[in-house]
Regions:
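Long, highly hydrophobic alpha-helical transmembrane signal-anchor segments
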Residues: 1-40, 90-108
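Inner-leaflet juxtamembrane helices
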Residues: 22-36, 129-144
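Membrane-proximal soluble regions of multi-pass membrane proteins
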Residues: 29-84, 146-159, 164-166
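Hydrophobic transmembrane alpha-helices
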Residues: 94-138
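Cytosolic/matrix-facing juxtamembrane and C-terminal tails of multi-pass cellular membrane proteins
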Residues: 130-178
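Loop-to-transmembrane boundary segments
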Residues: 76-98
Length: 178
């Protein structure tokens, strides 16, 4: 049974370490218009995720931004949509790596039950969050493009976007931090 506790401790350690690692990743690595983060044709601008009813259950999952004050909040003002778009890429990357690294649980607890624990851990703790990021990103990109167009004609309105086309001249360090 102590193999179970080692696997559980390993999973907990992955979860705890995921936040500081995600915060430390350079934001310039994450462009929502490039693979693997760009919306694929089969995703139909995020509409394919409506079949999974993500809108209904996404707010019921734990939100780490409530526990970690330095995390980007799930809900930001419309004035800063690109920051949130970028964070969806970071979150997707971190959760994908958590799936890969969680294979270590299978070596710590060699049991048929370890496969079940691994599957539940990844479906609830990682795949669901990846789906939420893939669902939200196209919607947030449309909001960012709308904001860009709205600000284009008004030189006195402060835009949080770096150029007329999101990420065309993009530098992560130029994004505002809220």
């Amino acid at each position: 049974m102590h193999g179970f506790w080692r696997a559980a401790l390993y999973a907990a350690a992955l979860g705890v370490l995921a936040h500081p690692v995600g915060q430390a990743l350079p934001r310039r690595w994450f462009d929502p218009h490039q693979a693997p983060y760009r919306c694929r044709d089969w995703e139909k601008g995020g509409r394919v995720y409506n079949k999974l009813h993500i809108r209904r259950w996404k707010d019921r999952l734990p939100d780490m931004s409530r526990l970690m004050p330095d995390m980007v909040k799930k809900k930001l003002s419309a004035a800063d949509p690109m920051s949130l778009v970028q964070e969806t890429c970071v979150a997707e990357c971190v959760h994908c790596w958590l799936i890969v690294l969680s294979v270590g649980m299978l070596f710590l607890w060699k049991s048929v039950w370890s496969w079940l624990l691994w599957l539940v851990y990844n479906l609830l703790g990682n795949v669901s969050f990846i789906l939420i990021q893939r669902y939200n990103r196209p919607r947030l990109l449309r909001l960012a493009e709308k904001e860009t167009k709205k600000n284009a004609g008004n030189p006195y309105r402060r835009s949080t976007l770096s150029s007329a086309t999101p990420f065309s001249d993009w530098k992560a360090d130029s994004l505002p931090v809220s």
